[in-house]
Amino acid sequence: DEELRRLHARLGVYSCTGNHEYRYEAEQKIQWLNRAGISMLRDSAVLIDSAFYVVGREDVVFPERVPLSEILNRQNVNRFKPVIVLNHSPNDLDEEVNAGADIALYGHTHHGQAFPGNIATRLVFEVAYGYARKGDTHIYVTSGLGLAGPQYRIGTVSEVAVLNVKFEK
């Protein structure tokens, strides 16, 4: 809690849910993150500084997950402004591409976490780690900080990805 409260950004700190929130006590975890100053975006969009949108997706394990195009329409997202989508699992990049997202950010894969998992994730996900561009959408999948299952990494690294974003007219 204390460490998360140290996260600060001039325009706010935003996140989306992932599969681990839904393993148990999801609502308590989400409330805890909100109390720590992290705005959890749950199939919702927020206009930042009247300049761009951040859209947070519910994880694919959430049964009432809403299609991205519906979120954008329901929240009257101005498609002439840049749209950044936070989506935990990179299992359907076409949804963000087809919805016209400018940037789509993902996690989930842990970059395989331990060899040979990093090879396996490349077989499962179109983009398992790093940067790619698909259509007009810039995609980044981070290996993240956390671990799933075994508490080690082999052949991959934990990371905090720092992206410098500049939108041109």
Language model: regions and residue ranges:
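Soluble catalytic domains of enzymes that build or remodel membrane lipids, polysaccharides, and related
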Residues: 1-169
